[in-house]
Amino acid sequence: MIRTKISAENLNLFYGDFHALKDINISMGERQVTALIGPSGCGKSTFLRCLNRMNDIIPTCRVQGKLMFEDSEIYHPDTDVVALRKRVGMVFQAPNPFPKSVYENVAYAPKLHGLKDKARLDEIVETSLRQAALWDEVKDRLHKPALGLSGGQQQRLCIARALAIQPEVLLMDEPTSALDPISTLKIEELIRELKQYYTIVIVTHNMQQAARISDKTAFFLVGDLVEFDDTEVIFTNPKDQRTEDYITGRFG
């Protein structure tokens, strides 16, 4: 029995008068990869940003309904957003390393949370870089600028940076869209490895990628969650005609 990690019940989100998410109901399992697919503007990235309240930075944004992280309500007035984001990490579309050394990029968040012990920081940096399949490539250049890494290495560094505070959930917003095919393959292999330890939610425009790496797939269209099922079902026997039309390239 797979334990539910994140669930939404009649979740609605508005940007001013614009209804961006409409009555979303979904349950995402622990240590599974859930892919969010759909055409541009369908609400998939908006939904992803709800999961660690990144939408809070938009003044006109308001949320109705229930969004749960295990037994805690994500949008409850008493929710500690900093603590939430420690448990729910995020990797963005374009690699965005800080203009610091490789080491300082990974050590940044643990230091921010008050960790000062050098030996412990060293351990976290190495462990995180190993988990991100980057350690062997950067172990001899830890104190050199992160911006000197290739695009694929920078994105894996950003994953290591997110892992450094030991989150339970990792959100990925099109993490390979700016990368070449070889770097994309490495990130996909990494995602398959990481799901042993983390719950992963990924937004992707790449149908083949969703089919390759995810356990569950959610198809969004103009703010509606049209269909959510095992990835194999979504791609081979979808229940909704709109899902089939999108997957087969009839629109999108």
Swiss-Prot record:
- Domain of life, source organism: Bacteria
Chief location category: membrane
Q: Please give the Gene Ontology molecular function terms for this protein.
A: ATP binding; ATP hydrolysis activity; ATPase-coupled phosphate ion transmembrane transporter activity
The entry describes its oligomerization and partners as: The complex is composed of two ATP-binding proteins (PstB), two transmembrane proteins (PstC and PstA) and a solute-binding protein (PstS).
Query: What's the name of its gene?
Result: pstB
Provide the GO biological process annotations.
Answer: phosphate ion transmembrane transport
Q: What is the lineage of its organism?
A: Bacteria, Bacillati, Bacillota, Clostridia, Eubacteriales
Q: Which family does it belong to?
A: Belongs to the ABC transporter superfamily. Phosphate importer (TC 3.A.1.7) family.
Taken from the record, one Pfam family name reads: ABC_tran
Protein source organism:
Heliobacterium mobile (Heliobacillus mobilis)
Q: Which residues form the ABC transporter domain?
A: 6-247
**EC number(s) stated in the UniProt entry for this protein:** 7.3.2.1
GO terms for cellular component: plasma membrane
* SUPFAM superfamilies the record matches: P-loop containing nucleoside triphosphate hydrolases
- Please give the function described in this protein's UniProt entry: Part of the ABC transporter complex PstSACB involved in phosphate import. Responsible for energy coupling to the transport system.
Q: What class of enzyme is it?
A: translocase
Listed InterPro entries: AAA+_ATPase, ABC_transporter-like_ATP-bd, ABC_transporter-like_CS, P-loop_NTPase, PstB-like
Print the keywords alphabetically: ATP-binding, Cell membrane, Membrane, Nucleotide-binding, Phosphate transport, Translocase, Transport
Instruction: Please give the catalytic activity noted in the UniProt record.
Output: phosphate(out) + ATP + H2O = ADP + 2 phosphate(in) + H(+)
**Keyword Ribosomal protein, does the record have it?**
no
Protein name, as recorded: Phosphate import ATP-binding protein PstB
Location(s) in or outside the cell:
Cell membrane
Residues at which ATP binds: G38, P39, S40, G41, C42, G43, K44, S45
Keyword presence, Translocase: yes
SMART domains to which the protein is assigned, alphabetical: AAA (SM00382)
Its membrane topology is listed as: Peripheral membrane protein
